């Protein structure tokens, strides 16, 4: 899990850039909370739980689903 979290932290700027498009209920102040968090993945998942009523598992799956789609689209565009 720590390896996943460090990958999330490494990709946070890319994820952050897409987050408001992926999750329309997010606002800039939500993303700033994640920016300041020591464990960015945990904070982001928690915010999605609050905003969307997801379980932790659902929030993680939604992040992954959007990330995979974004990554595939980036490869196709390249």
What role is predicted for each listed range?
Residues 1-78:
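Intrinsically disordered, low-complexity, hydrophilic segments
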